[in-house]
């Protein structure tokens, strides 16, 4: 499927409101995406952007007490969008997911947001009902492009969106990634008109677009003003089925950021809140390789392999999110600007 849900037990749900006539400053154009892992999934996070909007990320520090993650929320609406986590918690409580207490459960729902408030009406932003509805819609089929948290996303001057990708390692471990691309930087090489690292997404059969289409990109500025919007953010979720510690997940999240640097230029700017979560379901136990020095963690070799695959998959997911995007509020898509890049 080439999806994050290729990792057994992972489910993804979207919910959005999108008015057909949404514009910059009016109408609904926002949404949320929820990743539901199986019980017992451990997690970690690494934030490299200068303007993050997050929830419960301190809890994911490997030094802290709670190990398991019940859901991850990716939301539009900037900090207001964090309200959608209340709906995720309500859904999880109804399904008895969370840290067991004497009188009930406390769901663990870390999350991160993108800044998309100028796309659509400023007051049209996710509520708790968005989070609840995304959980209720979760399944193994993952829609991409202009959906969920990606509805109001943009990538430089172009429309951004949600993408996903996966890979299977020789060890049998499956790595899957979900990304929402809402970057301040550009995803297209202005010299060629092709996305950076376009060779990673052979399924699109991209070819060099004609010179006039490349020239048109140079004349295009973001409808919101290039680098004049307050904040942006690309969020990634890495999932794998390996049995790993929270500290190992943190190292994988760190490595996965390379996927953003390969496909977004610049990435990790003061205008972005670039954040990557990493989840490990624990379904596949991989014995440590022989010969690992006793001074090193027995997870070292596996973490290296999973981290490398995570970076590759995150790069592919970024490209998939942009290439599958549909126009919203007059923000052009890659397909709008470069029809000549696609085979007939």
Curated annotation (Swiss-Prot):
Gene Ontology terms, MF aspect: aminopeptidase activity
Establish whether keyword Transmembrane helix is in the entry.
yes
Q: What is its main location?
A: membrane
Q: Which UniProt keywords apply?
A: Aminopeptidase, Cell membrane, Hydrolase, Membrane, Protease, Transmembrane, Transmembrane helix
Q: What are the subcellular locations of this protein?
A: Cell membrane
Instruction: Set out the biological process GO terms recorded for this chain's protein.
Output: proteolysis
Q: Where are the transmembrane segments?
A: 25-45, 68-88, 104-124, 133-153, 161-181, 224-244, 276-296, 302-322
A single GO cellular-component term from the record reads: plasma membrane
Identify the EC number(s): 3.4.11.-
Its protein name is Uncharacterized aminopeptidase MT1375
What is the scientific name of the source organism? Answer: Mycobacterium tuberculosis (strain CDC 1551 / Oshkosh)
